[in-house]
Swiss-Prot record:
Molecular-function annotations in GO: structural constituent of ribosome
Source species: Photobacterium profundum (strain SS9)
Biological processes per GO annotation: translation
Assembly behavior: Part of the 50S ribosomal subunit.
Taxonomic lineage from the root: Bacteria, Pseudomonadati, Pseudomonadota, Gammaproteobacteria, Vibrionales
Membrane-spanning segments: none
A cellular component annotation (GO) from this entry: cytosolic large ribosomal subunit
Gene, per the UniProt record: rpmD
Protein's name according to its UniProt entry: Large ribosomal subunit protein uL30
Length: 59
């Protein structure tokens, strides 16, 4: 099975750039402290890098 990573939203998306809000939605994050488990792919890593200041990552 592919490697997975856990991503948790730690800060609000209110007042953020629309592209950053779209990245959070693309990752499946909806609210603060919401955690999702995603496959560790280049696309997912790119979205995480854009919103790194709003999320916490666990490998």
């Amino acid at each position: 099975m592919a490697n997975t990573i856990k991503v948790t939203q730690t800060k609000s998306s209110i007042g953020r750039l629309p592209k950053h809000v779209a990245c959070l939605r693309g990752l499946g994050l909806r609210r603060i402290n919401h955690t999702v488990e995603l496959e560790d792919t280049a696309c997912v890593r790119g979205m995480i890098n854009k919103v790194h200041y709003m999320v916490k990552i666990e490998e």
